[in-house]
UniProtKB/Swiss-Prot annotation:
Its EC number is 3.2.1.24. It is found in: Secreted. Gene3D superfamilies: 2.60.40.1360, Glycoside hydrolase 38, N terminal domain, Glycoside hydrolase family 38, central domain, Golgi alpha-mannosidase II, Golgi alpha-mannosidase II, domain 4. The active site is at D158. Residues 1-22 form the signal peptide. It comes from the Eukaryota. It catalyses: Hydrolysis of terminal, non-reducing alpha-D-mannose residues in alpha-D-mannosides. Belongs to the glycosyl hydrolase 38 family. PANTHER family: ALPHA-MANNOSIDASE, ALPHA-MANNOSIDASE C. Glycans are attached at residues 60, 96, 192, 222, 248, 467, 516, 527, 589, 760, 769, 848, 872, 912, 1040, 1057. It is an enzyme of class 3 (hydrolase). This is Alpha-mannosidase C. Binds 1 zinc ion per subunit.
Amino acid sequence: MFYKTFGFLFIYLIILISGTLSQKEIDSSNEQPVIEVFLVPHSHCDVGWLKTVEQYYTENVTLILNNVIETLTKDKSKKFNWAEIIYFERWWNDQNETLQNQVKQLISNKQFYFVGGGWTQNDEAITDYQAVINQMTLGHQFLFNQFGIKPEIGWQIDPFGPSTLTPTLFKLMGFKYHVINRIDERIKYIFNATEMNIPESGIMTIEREFEFLWYPSSNNPNISIFTHVLDHHYESPSLTIVDYEIPNLTYTSGFDFEGNPKINPPITILNLRFRADLLVKIIKERIDLFRHNNLLLPFGGDFRFQDSKIEFNNMDKLIKFINSNQKTYGVNIKYSTVDEYFEKVIQDTNINWKEDTTTTTTTTIPIGGDEFPKLSNLDYFDYTKCDYNDYQKYKTCSLYYSGFFSSYSELKQISRQSDSLLRIGEFLYSFANLISNNNNNDDDDDDDNDFNIQLKEISNILVQHRNVSGILTHHDAITGTAKTKVRDDYLLMLNQVQSNTMNNVIPNIVGYLLSNKSIQNFDYSCNNTIIMNSPQIGDIFSISFTNSLGWDRSEYIQIQLPPSTIVTVYNYNLISIQSQIVQRFDKDNQTFLYFNVETPSLGISTYFIIITSTNDDNVDDDVDKVFGDDELLIYLLKNGILSKPILSEISEISELSSSSSSSSSSSSSQITIGNSKFNLNFNYLNENYNLLTLTSFDDLIENEYSIPITQNYIEYISGNDNSYIFKPSGLPVNLKPESPKFYKVTGSLVQMITILYTNNCSQTYIVYNSTTTTTTTTTTTTTTNNDDSPPLELINDEQYFEIDNIVAAGWNKEIGSQFSSESINNDKTFYTSNGLELIERNYKSLFNDTTEFNMIAGNYYPVINTIQILDNKSKKQLTILTKQSFGASSQNNGELNLLFIRRSTDQFVTLNETMNDISNPLIKIKVLFGNSNSIENIRTPHSLLLENPLLPIYSIVSDITIDKWISIYNTVFKPFKTSLPYNLHLLTFTKQQQQQQQDFNEDNPLDYFIRFLNIYEISQSESFSQPIEFKLTNYFNNFNITNIRESSLTFNSIINNNTNSIILNPLNLISLIITISKN
């Protein structure tokens, strides 16, 4: 709503406003019920943004907590709401016992209230669901262990758009209510002034839909959460009187008493009535947005209450004056916690909850509340702001927050890699604890005791890694929307915890789990410099591959080698297997070794690389001299069991002449790579700068040939956009190369096409071929089985092709990838993942705005791991899988656009910095193309395999000889009896960190937290979108499970004390607390 005033003096504005307030909008009829105002004191404390996390804590947060706690202790009428547990936990640990006891009393009195309770307020657009769960668990476990508190209210007031994932997860955490804020302002507000007129705006205002029952998931239709949208942001109330004719006379007055005193003057005897009138005017405007007579009114803002006295003292005067004049104002105000507001709303509207018995995971569903609207299966992307000056320039709202989906790509990539590494560390640490505890019970061996000391150190390292992972979920961290110094600090933290985990956690535990004798002083490393450091003929290296998924796996891996090195590869049974050496022209001509690796579920498999030739030397000349006294290897070699690897055929592809490349269908120019399931066909295209370009696909399973599909780099020219906002100046164009080069790699295992656009921009297409091994597993397919069913072949590396995209952007350029296929008529409908499930997107104009740059930006959506288009008639489907987030869209029929990297000279007013991304990341994607039914069977497992790669751990074997090595170490660690079924994902297996304080007993062992997810959506797959029934005892190998309890998602509430047999429906998730020991 907009107001126009006329006048030239500030004092005249005050008189005009005061007169207006006192005459009409303040008077209250005796027939009107009193408006109950729940004033919610709070401070929004970003976990990094304009300052680093450390700076915010030491310079701001400590002041806030110290002063607020002091104020609340002195005055029981005062209340405060706190969200970011990362700051509170640190502050709490810095306090003495006396102050801690005071805080406990404030919490008990409900003066100090925790809302949300996560480590931070995570971004909702591009943060992976496992990272969200982990950061919420961090906060919830601290609150539960220290205070017995179980948060019930979501508080996501600053992320740039609410996702359907968040209410789904929050409901599984036991939340009843949810508060959100940043949604498209054209949905919230009516813009109908002459100077800023947006047709159809303000539906929430018109229909009073600022509160609703949100049913976020079509796969879990009974999950719902009562949701409140902040009507006017989370800051202290203010009112702006807009003068469009004379903008300099626009007048804002508010109640942010730590803010600008000209706008937020302190309360005095002289201005008390006027200021009270203004606050009541704000209240009465806002209460009309709701369907009851209760108003949640935020009182605070970014890092507010550093001076809690000035905030509370000024507001005290207003509260006292307004409440004492209730007949005049019809308003009653009180300091409140967020739950008090919801309790009153529920009381007034008769909403109740009952247990939902229709699902396999325990949750509640609402009864009553018919007066509230219901929102189903919809999220609130893209968040859009409407700025007056921006509107005057473009005659439309053009601030679409779809840029941060792709901003600072390298940060997004490293963050996701760090989460994958943490996941491996958590699994390994849990198994090491189980085995170590069993050894200590059986044998008080000094070596085991030494390892227990290491486990404590390892635990501390993982705690720090977990904490940093939580920090990176913050809505200004992974988004790339913080200042450069803060972003650099995030990267520094990530690199430090990754280094600690890689160097001090994973190698030590892998060595421990593989040992079959007492621990040896043996050097395991996550770094393959031991291979790269001038290997000699006869050198032997072991590589132990760690699998963090609950499925047996068989897939291709790549290991870097020194140039001109020939090797032989042996598997865990010491049987020689095929391998291929490839020179990667997109990676500075570096040399890589490819071979197939098989690993058991959650297990480890060891492979051996033997240097057989360097610089054309050959080991066959004198075997005894090369391998010394390693009798086992000499025996294997002399009996012809070892063989050299199959070398790749490398050829540079010359440019074709213009006559032969003038037609995209010219057979003489077509170049093909493929396997037994498909071929990729490439041609030189004049319309694409005569670049070698993917032009068609042969489906050898369906006997369909030359199916049109193209892919190439595109670039947008920036138009005043920044790390938050995407505002391209027009449609994308094909990226123009500089002296391009093309290479083809052929071989029996892997084939590649590499296209070098520039020195720092390239694409490499990778196709894998089946291989036959002489091991007990004779296929490259990964197998799985249900409890009593035979193995089913489902996943293999021939089902997809990879594209390694190495990208860089010049100033005011935004680089992406465009796929196009005439065989898919998707009618501009596409699907993006929120991490757990696909959300349908439809290319459309918003609020009748067909401005070109808004049609582009407003139809880009966040992708966590999957984007796809399909043709429902032909059943053709194109699916792109990724292990990092970015923005994507379908702007034309049969088209998918992915936006990888952005760079702009525009200085966003808040950051006052350019978006200067000079990184050169490699972004790997998996591509599935073909029959829709076939793809839907396999896309979700393939996505998890991509996101959770095998981790290689290296060691030098030749120092002690291989026969001694295998006498000390097992080549396989297999903790599960059998692989999980492919629709069942083991999401979490981690050791409980701390007992609840009031139940603490050092003699009680800590339990283990475990989560399972049925990964298939309803109707995704006829074969796999089925309920799964399983028992944990059928899987854990040599471990004894004595107690299984179902809990909330963050393990702070027991739901079922006896959970032996588990049933999971499609896309259901269950959390368990188990007592387990080694047999």
